[in-house]
């Protein structure tokens, strides 16, 4: 679908900060609030804007450390449905946060979250690897997040450059 310049501008603003109010969106795009609301409804109805989310640094909250793993999955695609059927079976598991079709050495990239490495290991061995089309898996545990969806998790460091003025 082709978006107008204003629609695209709204999408880009909301992608950076989904908490931007309709009034602020209107001011930033030179639209009225009612025009902005119409654009948002259209974008939501057409599933261009799918969901409004927050990025949380869970490592700073005691008791919510958890484990995130990226799993490379090789599968045998089925005639007529390709990778879609197995991807659908995988993304229905509650542990699964994301599934991507990939190019390269493996077919699917699956991101899951669990409370412990053992919980992730049980998911891989008891649920994921037992699916008919799955040939092999390789699990990578995320040790630390530095940047996620464009957001840097490390605190801003002071600028140590010397100020030069005329």
Predicted regions and their residues:
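A compositional/biophysical signature of low hydrophobicity enriched in polar/charged and small residues
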Residues: 1-166
């Amino acid at each position: 679908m082709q978006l107008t310049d204003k629609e695209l501008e709204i999408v880009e603003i909301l992608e950076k900060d989904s908490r931007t109010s309709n009034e602020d969106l209107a001011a930033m795009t030179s639209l009225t609030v009612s025009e902005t609301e119409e654009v948002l409804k259209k974008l939501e109805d057409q599933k261009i804007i799918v969901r409004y989310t927050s990025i949380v640094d869970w490592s700073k909250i005691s008791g919510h450390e958890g484990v995130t793993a990226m799993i490379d999955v090789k599968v045998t695609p089925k005639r007529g449905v390709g990778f879609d059927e197995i991807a659908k079976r995988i993304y229905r598991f509650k542990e699964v946060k994301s599934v991507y079709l990939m190019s390269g050495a493996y077919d699917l990239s699956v991101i899951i979250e669990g409370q412990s490495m053992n919980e992730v290991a049980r998911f891989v061995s008891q649920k994921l690897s037992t699916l008919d089309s799955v040939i092999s898996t390789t699990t990578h545990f995320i040790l630390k997040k530095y940047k996620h969806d464009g957001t840097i998790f490390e605190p801003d460091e002071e600028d140590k450059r010397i100020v030069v003025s005329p």
